Amino acid sequence: MSEEVNRPEKEYSASSIQVLEGLEAVRKRPAMYIGDIGEKGLHHLVYEVVDNSIDEALAGYCTDIEVTINEDGSVSVRDNGRGIPTDYHEKEGRSALEVVLTVLHAGGKFDKGSYKVSGGLHGVGVSCVNALSTLLIAEVHRDGKIYRETFSKGVPTSKLEIVGECSDRGTTITFKPDGEIFTHTTEYKYEILSNRLRELAFLNKGIQLTITDKRVKDEQGGYLSETFHSKDGLKEFVQYLDATRGEPIIESIIYLDTEKNGVPVEVAMQYNDSFSENVHSY
C-alpha cells in the first residue's frame, strides 16, 4: 500500500530562476571555481595569479616572477612580462585590463596567436581572485606608462589611471582575500607557497621565482625570502625528489623531451632502491 507523502507546496515559476550577473556566481558558489573555501582554496588564489605570469614565461616574454606576502596579509604577484593590455576593448566598452579582471572566460589564452600553451582555470582564474578579494590592485607597466586600477569583490572602485612613467614592463597584482568567503582562515602559509614556487621552477626551467614574507624577519633583520631557479628542469626535480628516497640503482636520469601533433611531452625518471614508487604528473 503506497503512502502519500505530504510536501508543502512551493511555487516554482519564472520568478524562481535567478540570473547572476558578472562575478556574482563566483561569490555565490566559490568552491565551484577554486575547489573549496578552506586553506587549499585560499592558496589557490595565489596559484591562479602566478599561472598568468607562467603563461607569459611559456610564451617567451617573462623571466622573473616575484610573490610577496605583505604585512597586512595581502599578496602581491609581480612579473616582467608584456603587461596585461590596457587599451580600449571595443566589444566590452572598457579597458582590456578591466575586462580580464571582471569577466569570466576573458583572456589572451583564447586567441590562438597569443599563447600556444597555458595553465590556470582556462580564463576564469584572475577574475575569480578579484571576485573573492576585498581589495585588488592591478598595476601594469606597459608602453612607457604605469597604469593602475582598484577593485573590491570583483567591482571596480576606481577608473583605469596613468599614475607614472616607466622604462620596464610587467604586471603586479595585489589582493586581499575576503574573510566573508574564507571563513576558516585568510592567513597564507609561507611553506605551502614556497613549495609551489619551487615546483614551478623545476617545471619551467630558466624562470626565476622569488617568494618573500614581509610578516617575518630573519636573524639579520631582513625578510624571510627564497629564490628558485632550475637550469635542467625535470632532471633536477627528480634529483630533488629522490634525495631522501634511497640510493639510485641507475645513476643517470632517464629523460625524454619530444613533441607529437603539437603536444609537447617531457619525462624524467630514475630507479632507486626505495620500496614504493613516486609519480608526479602535470
Locate predicted features:
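A conserved short beta-strand within the histidine kinase catalytic ATPase domain
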Residues: 63-69
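Bergerat-fold GHKL ATPase/HATPase_c domain
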Residues: 1-50, 99
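GHKL/Bergerat-fold ATPase module in large chromosome/replication-associated machines
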Residues: 212-282
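GHKL-type ATPase core
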Residues: 2-15, 73-96, 107-232, 237
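Conserved ATP-binding N-box helix of the HATPase_c
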Residues: 40-63, 125-132
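Conserved helix-loop functional segments at active or binding sites
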Residues: 25-28, 32, 55, 59, ...
